[in-house]
Amino acid sequence: QNLEEILKAFFFFYLPIILPLHPRTKNAIEQFELTHYLHSKNIQVCEPLGYVDTQSLIMNATMVITDSGGVTKECYYHKVPGILTDKQTEWVETVKEGWNIQAGPSAKKIIDAYLNLKIPTTQNNILGKGEAAINTAQKLNELLNKS
Protein backbone atom coordinates (compact mmCIF):
# COMPACT_ATOMS: atom_id res chain seq x y z
CA GLN A 1 0.00 0.00 0.00
CA ASN A 2 2.84 2.44 0.82
CA LEU A 3 4.52 1.77 -2.52
CA GLU A 4 1.26 2.30 -4.37
CA GLU A 5 0.68 5.62 -2.58
CA ILE A 6 4.13 6.87 -3.62
CA LEU A 7 3.66 5.76 -7.23
CA LYS A 8 0.21 7.42 -7.36
CA ALA A 9 1.81 10.75 -6.47
CA PHE A 10 4.06 10.55 -9.54
CA PHE A 11 1.04 10.87 -11.83
CA PHE A 12 0.50 14.40 -10.52
CA PHE A 13 3.94 15.72 -11.48
CA TYR A 14 4.52 17.29 -14.86
CA LEU A 15 8.29 17.39 -14.28
CA PRO A 16 10.46 14.59 -15.66
CA ILE A 17 10.90 11.82 -13.10
CA ILE A 18 13.97 9.61 -13.19
CA LEU A 19 13.25 6.54 -11.11
CA PRO A 20 16.22 4.26 -10.38
CA LEU A 21 14.54 1.08 -9.15
CA HIS A 22 16.17 -1.32 -6.72
CA PRO A 23 15.54 -4.93 -7.84
CA ARG A 24 13.40 -5.63 -4.74
CA THR A 25 11.27 -2.55 -5.45
CA LYS A 26 10.90 -3.54 -9.08
CA ASN A 27 9.83 -7.05 -8.02
CA ALA A 28 7.31 -5.60 -5.55
CA ILE A 29 5.83 -3.36 -8.27
CA GLU A 30 5.42 -6.38 -10.52
CA GLN A 31 4.17 -8.68 -7.74
CA PHE A 32 1.48 -6.23 -6.62
CA GLU A 33 0.55 -5.36 -10.23
CA LEU A 34 1.50 -1.70 -9.95
CA THR A 35 3.40 -1.38 -13.25
CA HIS A 36 0.61 0.76 -14.75
CA TYR A 37 1.77 3.59 -12.48
CA LEU A 38 5.07 3.67 -14.38
CA HIS A 39 3.46 4.18 -17.81
CA SER A 40 3.60 7.94 -17.97
CA LYS A 41 5.51 10.11 -20.43
CA ASN A 42 7.37 11.90 -17.67
CA ILE A 43 8.59 8.76 -15.83
CA GLN A 44 11.88 7.19 -16.88
CA VAL A 45 12.65 3.97 -15.02
CA CYS A 46 16.28 2.87 -14.86
CA GLU A 47 18.56 0.45 -13.02
CA PRO A 48 20.07 1.54 -9.69
CA LEU A 49 22.76 4.18 -10.18
CA GLY A 50 26.26 4.49 -8.79
CA TYR A 51 27.39 7.28 -6.50
CA VAL A 52 28.64 9.71 -9.18
CA ASP A 53 25.53 9.35 -11.35
CA THR A 54 23.29 9.76 -8.30
CA GLN A 55 25.11 12.93 -7.28
CA SER A 56 24.80 14.31 -10.81
CA LEU A 57 21.05 13.69 -10.84
CA ILE A 58 20.60 15.32 -7.43
CA MET A 59 22.66 18.39 -8.35
CA ASN A 60 20.61 18.91 -11.51
CA ALA A 61 17.20 18.15 -10.00
CA THR A 62 14.44 20.63 -9.24
CA MET A 63 13.58 18.47 -6.24
CA VAL A 64 14.03 14.88 -5.08
CA ILE A 65 11.51 12.41 -3.69
CA THR A 66 13.27 9.75 -1.63
CA ASP A 67 13.08 7.20 1.14
CA SER A 68 16.87 7.10 1.48
CA GLY A 69 18.57 8.73 4.44
CA GLY A 70 21.75 9.09 2.40
CA VAL A 71 19.96 10.85 -0.44
CA THR A 72 18.21 13.08 2.11
CA LYS A 73 21.61 14.25 3.31
CA GLU A 74 22.98 14.66 -0.23
CA CYS A 75 20.00 16.85 -1.16
CA TYR A 76 20.88 19.10 1.76
CA TYR A 77 24.54 19.32 0.73
CA HIS A 78 23.57 20.19 -2.86
CA LYS A 79 20.85 22.64 -1.76
CA VAL A 80 18.12 20.71 -3.54
CA PRO A 81 14.78 20.37 -1.72
CA GLY A 82 13.63 16.87 -0.92
CA ILE A 83 10.34 15.21 -0.14
CA LEU A 84 10.77 12.26 2.20
CA THR A 85 8.47 9.26 1.82
CA ASP A 86 9.55 7.60 5.05
CA LYS A 87 7.45 8.08 8.17
CA GLN A 88 10.55 9.30 10.03
CA THR A 89 14.07 10.44 9.24
CA GLU A 90 17.34 10.47 11.10
CA TRP A 91 18.12 13.83 9.45
CA VAL A 92 15.51 15.88 11.32
CA GLU A 93 17.79 18.93 11.16
CA THR A 94 17.30 19.10 7.38
CA VAL A 95 13.53 19.05 7.90
CA LYS A 96 13.69 21.78 10.56
CA GLU A 97 15.69 23.97 8.17
CA GLY A 98 13.14 23.41 5.42
CA TRP A 99 15.38 21.61 2.94
CA ASN A 100 13.43 18.38 3.32
CA ILE A 101 9.72 17.84 3.90
CA GLN A 102 8.51 14.78 5.79
CA ALA A 103 5.52 13.60 3.74
CA GLY A 104 5.51 9.90 4.48
CA PRO A 105 4.08 7.29 2.11
CA SER A 106 0.92 9.22 1.22
CA ALA A 107 0.10 10.45 -2.29
CA LYS A 108 -1.85 13.39 -0.88
CA LYS A 109 0.94 14.45 1.48
CA ILE A 110 3.61 14.07 -1.22
CA ILE A 111 1.58 16.22 -3.62
CA ASP A 112 0.83 18.77 -0.88
CA ALA A 113 4.55 18.93 -0.04
CA TYR A 114 5.33 19.59 -3.69
CA LEU A 115 2.65 22.28 -4.04
CA ASN A 116 3.87 24.03 -0.89
CA LEU A 117 7.57 23.59 -1.62
CA LYS A 118 9.59 26.66 -0.69
CA ILE A 119 13.30 26.58 -1.31
CA PRO A 120 15.10 28.02 1.71
CA THR A 121 17.25 31.06 1.03
CA THR A 122 19.93 30.12 3.56
CA GLN A 123 21.72 27.04 4.76
CA ASN A 124 23.38 26.84 8.15
CA ASN A 125 25.72 23.91 7.43
CA ILE A 126 24.07 21.88 10.17
CA LEU A 127 25.68 18.72 8.82
CA GLY A 128 29.13 20.29 8.59
CA LYS A 129 30.96 22.04 5.80
CA GLY A 130 32.25 18.92 4.04
CA GLU A 131 35.72 19.39 5.48
CA ALA A 132 35.89 16.38 7.84
CA ALA A 133 38.36 14.40 5.70
CA ILE A 134 40.70 17.39 5.30
CA ASN A 135 40.56 18.19 9.02
CA THR A 136 41.20 14.56 9.95
CA ALA A 137 44.16 14.31 7.55
CA GLN A 138 45.65 17.53 8.94
CA LYS A 139 45.31 16.30 12.54
CA LEU A 140 46.88 12.95 11.67
CA ASN A 141 49.71 14.74 9.88
CA GLU A 142 50.30 16.93 12.95
CA LEU A 143 50.36 13.87 15.22
CA LEU A 144 52.77 12.00 12.95
CA ASN A 145 55.10 15.00 12.69
CA LYS A 146 55.28 15.33 16.51
CA SER A 147 56.73 11.83 16.83
Model-based region annotation:
Residues P16-P23:
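Short internal beta-strands
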Residues Q1-F13, T25-S147:
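Nucleotide-activated sugar donor-binding and catalytic core shared by glycosyltransferases
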